[in-house]
Each structure stands twice: as structure tokens, then as C-alpha cells.
């Protein structure tokens, strides 16, 4: 009896690089060259948008988990179009009363295409200087016994 192990090289190309990012109060799993419908963004078509709230980033063999965000990670998106979602009907009624209310809602959406997922230094360190403040300690006062 022979032991044959199946190789794990049959994984798809899309699982090599992905990121989980936060936008519009939701978390999305972003992959390069895919499009996503997110809540309406204030941008025109063909505009470039950069998401910096990256929660997790996986690149081939390494996984970076943010606390809460991954440092210097960016996702670059391109706005493809603006559209509206399907209509949702809401019907309210009170039984045994003549109160009925039928309302509808269509969510405004923006379709975006993921152009790139990068991690690296975005700004030089000189722009984000931290000032060091020295604490002055008071000497302990000696109690005199008179």
C-alpha cells in the first residue's frame, strides 16, 4: 500500500494575494482585478481611490494582521460606475386598524475595480515626527524630626 499525498499546488491564483479592508462600515475581502459593489462614494467615474484601513493582508506565504490596521498597507481602487440596488419593499400594518404603509428603498452603490494591493512605506519618516517629552521628577522631600 502506497501513501500518495495530493499536492496543494492546485490552489487558485486569486488566493495568493488578498486583503480584508474596512469601508462604509463594512468589511470586504478584496482581490486584485475583481470588482465590488460598495456603498456610494463621493467620486466620479474613472477616479482612483485609496483604502488605508486594511485589517488583514495575505501575500503568498506571509499573513499580516493589523492591530487594528496593517501599517503602510493600501488598496487602490478605480470607480467603474454608480448604480442603484434592487428595490426593497417594507410594509407596515396594524391589525384590526385601518393603518397600512408601504414603502420602498433603493440603496445607492458604487462599483469599484481593485487595481493593486500594496504594503510599504507611504510617507517619509520626517513628516511623522514624534516629539519626546522628558518628565521632570520632583525630589522626595525629607521629613525632618524636630
From Swiss-Prot:
Residues 128-146 have a biased composition (Basic and acidic residues). The keyword Cytoplasm does not apply. PROSITE patterns: RIBOSOMAL_L21. It holds the Pfam family Ribosomal_L21p. Transmembrane segments: none annotated. SUPFAM superfamilies: L21p-like (SSF141091). One of its GO terms (molecular function) is structural constituent of ribosome. GO terms for cellular component: cytoplasm; ribonucleoprotein complex; ribosome. It comes from the Bacteria. Keywords: Ribonucleoprotein, Ribosomal protein, RNA-binding, rRNA-binding. GO terms for biological process: translation. InterPro entries: bL21-like, bL21-like_sf, Ribosomal_bL21, Ribosomal_bL21_CS. Residues 117-146 are annotated as: Disordered. Belongs to the bacterial ribosomal protein bL21 family. Part of the 50S ribosomal subunit. Contacts protein L20. This protein binds to 23S rRNA in the presence of protein L20. This is Large ribosomal subunit protein bL21. It comes from Prochlorococcus marinus (strain MIT 9301).
Amino acid at each position: 500500500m502506497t501513501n500518495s499525498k495530493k499536492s496543494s499546488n492546485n490552489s487558485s491564483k486569486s488566493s495568493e494575494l488578498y486583503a480584508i479592508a474596512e469601508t462604509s462600515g463594512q468589511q470586504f475581502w478584496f482581490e486584485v482585478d475583481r470588482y465590488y459593489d460598495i456603498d456610494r462614494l463621493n467620486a466620479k467615474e474613472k477616479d482612483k481611490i485609496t483604502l488605508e484601513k486594511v485589517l488583514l493582508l495575505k501575500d503568498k506565504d506571509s499573513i499580516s494582521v493589523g492591530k487594528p490596521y496593517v501599517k503602510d498597507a493600501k488598496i487602490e481602487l478605480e470607480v467603474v460606475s454608480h448604480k442603484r440596488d434592487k428595490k426593497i419593499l417594507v410594509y407596515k400594518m396594524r391589525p384590526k386598524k385601518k393603518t397600512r404603509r408601504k414603502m420602498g428603498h433603493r440603496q445607492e452603490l458604487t462599483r469599484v475595480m481593485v487595481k493593486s494591493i500594496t504594503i510599504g512605506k507611504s510617507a517619509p519618516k520626517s513628516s511623522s515626527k514624534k516629539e519626546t517629552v522628558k518628565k521632570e521628577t520632583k525630589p522626595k522631600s525629607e521629613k525632618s524630626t524636630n
